[in-house]
């Protein structure tokens, strides 16, 4: 495949989590093109919390980008670029579900939107969950639900779960541990 080269980049917006750029690209045929690019500055982590009975905890929350309630695994941005993703996953588990775990295991990494964003999410499996206390952020509103892995797989294929990180986590877990 012939090489595409970035020949320039203009910052269009800088926010607390992302920066938005227009990239100026030189195409193999000599033409130039403009591509939008979103840089997720801190990175993120997510966690698939598995209860002792084998069920999985999920959260429902409103997502403005898709203007609907989304069923997802707990996740969030790292506090800084130096925060280990396992610490971020552990924090998000307790903040969002009210459970904690000392047994987090790396499951998979996913690039969420390769066409225009560099966001990568490390996803962890949490077992041996212990009840704790939910610590939602001031403007974070979500509910916690419990589902069997089979229910979640069916919800993926029926379109009830559309969040990419959650789909990847559930299917990776099912493939690795439930076969």
PLM-predicted stretches and their roles:
Residues 1-7, 69, 125, 139-179:
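Nudix hydrolase/Nudix homology domain
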Residues 2-3, 38-41, 46-48, 52-91:
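Conserved Nudix-box catalytic region and its N-terminal flanking loop in Nudix hydrolases
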Residues 8-46, 52:
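Acidic, metal-coordinating catalytic segment for phosphate/diphosphate chemistry
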Residues 9-12, 109-113:
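Short, solvent-exposed loop/turn elements at beta->coil junctions and helix N-caps
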Residues 20-24, 48, 58, 123-125, ...:
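Conserved hydrophobic/aromatic beta-strand scaffold that supports enzyme active sites
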Residues 24-29, 113-132:
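Active-site-adjacent beta-strand/loop module that shapes the phosphate/pyrophosphate-binding cleft
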Residues 29-30, 51-55, 62, 127-131, ...:
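Short loop segments at secondary-structure junctions
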Residues 58, 73-106, 124, 136-139, ...:
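The catalytic Nudix box helix
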